[in-house]
């Protein structure tokens, strides 16, 4: 089954393709589709549905969308739904992943409560009357310094996953999938997609 993936993020596509194994994911840009929806929801679920519906309205075919982010207790839940753009408004430009996680560490200097969680909402949009959403989390804390591990992407070098007992960037690829917010949500979604196909 071909699924459009409502994203422009190659890393996310690679990870989601692996997690869903057997389902071909197609990014809009791979078919020359301009896709830049206004993610103006208040929650991860809102934004996943907004992205899925926006792409469905263009392709009229099954769409998968994910919205995820990092919520840090001591920062009032920030960066939250703005994780991907963290610090960019103040900087007036796009920031690299390293610049974002270094900014996060700077903003947490002197803070002892380092509890945080990654949240992932995945929406499967089959039609305007068949929409499914799954949300999962992975709990942990923000490290004091970045790890030298080279696994993962984004904030993985500074996120300690409680279940895994280590920094996410240090986890082997298969292990990350076991503990990550996206891995948990994708496993449930994979089962749901398989059920839908057998209806």
Residue ranges and their predicted role:
Residues 2-4, 11-199:
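Anionic-ligand binding patches
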